[in-house]
């Protein structure tokens, strides 16, 4: 699997190419959690979001389909006793309905064959009054962003779709999810976080 193969160098490449964006978006997402929150993170990767979230929330279950990525995330969060790591499929989570206050799925929607199924699962496990947070890399008109996507695809990332800001907004509208706000960290490859609130 591509993500297992690159798990050992993923952070190095990401930090060199897009470190400013990653720092801003992870801090923003973590700021949406607090000490009373039980959080589920899907597609946690190497733990880029996991560590700052774990430092703020009550509990975090961090999941990924790639065991290599999970191993890197576990190393990164080894001093956080409130984190549990599990292998899981974002389209078929084993958690009970309405189990989490915050549900995070970063940089994964564009990789999925069936993003609607994933969105429905994220909605299912989010508690009423909770928040679903979906940060995703988007393209802008600059050459560097599109080249980055092509580079990762060439290595085997298998992007199913690419978004710019407009098409990312339209993506959620077409699926019937009302996004209360968007937050974009700008840089070489911007990252836009969609915030979906599940009303009580």
Tell where the protein language model's regions lie, with residue ranges.
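A short glycine-rich, Lys/Arg-flanked "PGG" loop and its adjoining helix->strand segment in the class I
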Residues: 116-128
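Class I SAM-dependent methyltransferase SAM/SAH-binding core
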Residues: 40-92
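Acidic carboxylate diad motif detector
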Residues: 134-136
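Conserved class I S-adenosyl-L-methionine
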Residues: 1-34, 48, 72, 76, ...
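A short acidic, Gly/Pro-enriched loop at the edge of an enzyme's catalytic core
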Residues: 91-103
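A short SAM/SAH-binding and catalytic strip from SAM-dependent methyltransferases
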Residues: 102-114
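Short alpha-helix
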Residues: 160-176
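Core SAM-dependent methyltransferase catalytic element
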Residues: 175-177, 181-200
């Amino acid at each position: 699997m591509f993500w297992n193969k690159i798990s050992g160098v993923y952070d190095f490449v990401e930090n060199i190419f897009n470190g400013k964006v990653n720092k801003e978006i992870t801090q923003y997402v973590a700021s949406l959690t607090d000490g009373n929150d039980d959080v589920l993170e899907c597609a946690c990767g190497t733990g880029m979001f996991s560590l700052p979230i774990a430092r703020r929330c009550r509990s975090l279950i961090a999941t990924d389909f790639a065991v290599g990525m999970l191993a890197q995330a576990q190393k990164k969060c080894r001093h956080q006793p409130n984190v549990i790591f599990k292998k899981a499929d974002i389209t078929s989570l084993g958690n009970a309905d309405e189990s989490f206050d915050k549900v995070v799925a970063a940089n994964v929607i564009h990789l999925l064959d069936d993003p609607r199924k994933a969105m429905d699962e994220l909605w299912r496990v989010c508690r009423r009054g909770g928040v679903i947070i979906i940060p995703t890399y988007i393209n802008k008109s600059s050459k560097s962003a599109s080249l980055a996507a092509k580079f990762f695809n060439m290595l085997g990332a298998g992007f199913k779709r690419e978004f710019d800001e407009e098409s990312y907004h339209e993506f959620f509208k077409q699926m019937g999810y009302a996004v209360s706000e968007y937050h974009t960290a700008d840089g070489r490859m911007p990252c836009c976080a969609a915030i979906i609130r599940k009303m009580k």
